[in-house]
Amino acid sequence: MFKLLKFLIKFILTILIIVIIGLVGGCIYLNSAYGINVIDVFNQLKIMNEEINENEYIENKFSNEDLDSSKNISSLNNVINKNGDGTYTIDPDKISMLEEDIYLTDKQIGAIVNEIFKKEMEKNGQEYSKYNPEVKEVTFSNITPTSTYFTYMVKLDCSSIKEEYNTFPFTLLKNYIPNYLYLSMTSSITHLEKPFSYEINYVSTKISKLTDEQTFSFLNTIKNVTQLDFASEIYTSLSTTLINLMIGNENYEDGFTYSLSKNALSGVKDYTFKEENGNRYYVIKRGLI
């Protein structure tokens, strides 16, 4: 978790570096030293600064209603608890015995993973809370009997960085740093032979309103300037964290589904993904007790 948070902050600071080089070093230097088109970079930053209407931009947005509908599943009734102040608590230890497999939509999984993610932040990442990273979307696609594409979107509040770097020359950069970043990543999850064993592989990345091509160009610019592969960093730091929070295994025991299975009487034995009648599901599988 700390690696994830440090990566996100490093990502924002790298944007600062690129802008400084562009303003101080000039177009000719960047083009000759790194092969970077400064005009393209500033256009990309301009797009990243555009205000985003989440209701229009996030196609598969989840809400508390998805937590409530998950709570209505009998086996999860005591796992998902709504507090008096409207917040939620997830307690896998309170799982009831499964009478059948549990089918959860991608919206329900997004809502559950976001709650677990927030609790992890409260426990282990208080110094990063000002950046308020939160899961905004989860979708499943390309579902086969053994694999699926898992796409998520994380929102990061960058406004506090503008307040921290309030001396010259950083004061010149405020207009180039977005208030919020929306990082989207698609990974493939392949189920291996044993229960709760899976392999995660990188597929694609997208940043805010940038197109796929613009995102690739921007990440390539960062790589050229810093020698850091941020697409790989996002994959290893962010994707694996969120997927492990959803599934889990003996190496990541806090994963939601694996935590449910640790209660031997629950009957939870594994996970899978299914598509039925045009609907996509994450399935918590019941085994013989």
Mark where each language-model region is.
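Extracellular/lumenal and peripheral-membrane lipid-interaction modules
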Residues: 3-289
